[in-house]
């Protein structure tokens, strides 16, 4: 049997959570999810694609990456819901990655809510795949649902 102090502490934690303080929200989960996918999942999928063709020339790798970005349906590689290649400069691609998630929670503060988020990155495919986080311009934010 737990003591009264334990019950008070647990009740306080539950009340704080229902009040929204200290609890993860669907928006923060979506932000973290898209960032992780932008930093790890997409580079891994792109690296796997480029390596499967045995390409070593930076120009060949960039052309293959351009084709991959254009022809790949993002959910098919389980990366994000959609992406937009904003620009290409040589072997560098400026890409916006978008994610929309719905809360599975039946409890406040996220009950039945959904959120969208965007992560903006530059991927350099010259040798391997490197990732650079960049600020999202207004045009990227305008594309959020």
PLM regions and their residue ranges:
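Conserved non-transmembrane functional hotspots
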Residues: 63-80
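Bacterial signal peptide processing site
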Residues: 21-26
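Short, low-complexity, disordered segments immediately C-terminal to signal peptides
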Residues: 27-40
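Extracytosolic low-complexity repeat regions of secreted or lipid-anchored proteins
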Residues: 82-145
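Bacterial N-terminal signal peptides
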Residues: 10-19
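N-terminal alpha-helical signal peptides/signal-anchor transmembrane segments
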Residues: 38-65
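Bacterial N-terminal signal peptides that target proteins for export
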Residues: 1-10
């Amino acid at each position: 049997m737990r003591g009264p102090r334990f019950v008070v502490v647990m009740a306080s934690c539950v009340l704080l959570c229902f009040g929204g303080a200290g609890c993860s929200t669907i928006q923060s989960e979506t932000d973290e999810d898209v960032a992780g996918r932008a930093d790890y999942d997409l580079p891994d999928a792109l690296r796997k694609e480029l390596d499967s063709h045995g390409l070593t020339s930076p120009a060949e790798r960039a052309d293959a990456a351009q084709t991959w970005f254009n022809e790949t349906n993002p959910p098919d590689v389980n990366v994000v819901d959609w992406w937009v290649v904003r620009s290409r400069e040589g072997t560098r691609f400026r890409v916006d990655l978008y994610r929309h998630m719905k809360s599975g929670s039946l409890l406040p503060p996220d009950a039945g809510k959904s959120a969208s988020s965007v992560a903006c990155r530059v991927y350099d495919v010259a040798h391997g795949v490197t990732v650079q986080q960049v600020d999202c311009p207004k045009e990227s934010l305008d594309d959020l649902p």
